[in-house]
Amino acid sequence: MQGSVTEFLKPRLVDIEQVNSTRAKVTLEPLERGFGHTLGNALRRILLSSMPGCAVTEVEIDGVLHEYSSKEGVQEDILEILLNLKGLAVTIEGKDEALLTLSKSGTGPVTAADITHDGDVTIVNPDHVICHLTGNNDISMRIRVERGRGYVPASARAQTEDDDRPIGRLLVDASFSPVARIAYNVEAARVEQRTDLDKLVIDMTTNGTIDPEEAIRRSATILAEQLDAFVELRDVTEQAVVEEKPEFDPILLRPVDDLELTVRSANCLKAEAIHYIGDLVQRTEVELLKTPNLGKKSLTEIKDVLASRGLSLGMRLENWPPASLADDL
């Protein structure tokens, strides 16, 4: 395979092996040597930490005041119930949070299928066991599910909660990422005579709320959007060069009529071809006094008007007049 030494091979999606509904293997090749680990590690970190999803954040169980207790007639203690609730795979459409309710009595397992919710909520794993009832007892709880990203421990949210949080409202460590497991492997690849290439194999398992292939696509989009800032560095620099300060103060480009001088003074300046304020400030007092019909009274008027605008006579302006005015003169 012949090509420029500065050209990089572009990977292509070679194979998507759907192991089951929640697990898939994605293979990309060929990659330049070293790019397998570079891309694999970046995608892995994004998939684990930056994928948006839904998770249980708060739980209220009737008759329970804190998580270090137990409930009569329930086989599991409260901490184990909270751990099981973290395993719910939920999606929410059209809003950022939802309140679910669970109420069941009798004997046997309590599963996610026993949860009551509105049409905007979908529970992907209805067979997920939450707890077991014994001795014909009952349990009721309210479960808050929120949309988020990454991992947010309960302790972090507790610090931002108000002190008037009701007793019995239990905060849950929230893992919002829909990716349950992600691993990658870099193997050797060959294209024609080149044998020093990489093949990236990504093995991923989700909680069922997102298709593995879609998760890969979203993570790659997130990475590309973040890298766009580096691609635009040159454009930002060029734009900054273009946006330089104007060569002259805009007031110097205005006609002398804007100074609202007396008719006598204005006519004297026009007779001397002084059309713009920039023309005027370059003249000295001696030069103006040589102007026919312009006396000391008019000179004083001109000096006062210029001073009120932060200007004075005898100023030196390099490259005057600018091209835009020179064309009009």
Curated annotation (Swiss-Prot):
- Gene Ontology CC: cytoplasm; DNA-directed RNA polymerase complex
Gene Ontology terms for molecular function: DNA binding; DNA-directed RNA polymerase activity; protein dimerization activity
Q: Does Transcription appear among the keywords? A: yes
Q: What is its EC number?
A: 2.7.7.6
Q: Where is this region: Alpha N-terminal domain (alpha-NTD)?
A: 1-234
CDD domains, A to Z: RNAP_alpha_NTD (cd06928)
Chain positions covered by the region annotation Alpha C-terminal domain (alpha-CTD): 248-329
Give the UniProt keywords, A-Z: DNA-directed RNA polymerase, Nucleotidyltransferase, Transcription, Transferase
Which reaction is catalysed here? RNA(n) + a ribonucleoside 5'-triphosphate = RNA(n+1) + diphosphate
Q: Which GO terms describe its biological process?
A: DNA-templated transcription
Give the first-level EC class, as a single word: transferase
Q: What does this protein do?
A: DNA-dependent RNA polymerase catalyzes the transcription of DNA into RNA using the four ribonucleoside triphosphates as substrates.
On assembly, the entry states:
Homodimer. The RNAP catalytic core consists of 2 alpha, 1 beta, 1 beta' and 1 omega subunit. When a sigma factor is associated with the core the holoenzyme is formed, which can initiate transcription.
NCBIfam families referenced in this protein's UniProt entry, alphabetically? PRK05182.1-2, PRK05182.2-5, rpoA
Q: Which family does it belong to?
A: Belongs to the RNA polymerase alpha chain family.
Quote the record's domain comment. Answer: The N-terminal domain is essential for RNAP assembly and basal transcription, whereas the C-terminal domain is involved in interaction with transcriptional regulators and with upstream promoter elements.
Q: What is this protein called?
A: DNA-directed RNA polymerase subunit alpha
- Native source organism of the sequence: Shewanella frigidimarina (strain NCIMB 400)
Kindly list the organism's lineage: Bacteria, Pseudomonadati, Pseudomonadota, Gammaproteobacteria, Alteromonadales
This protein's encoding gene: rpoA
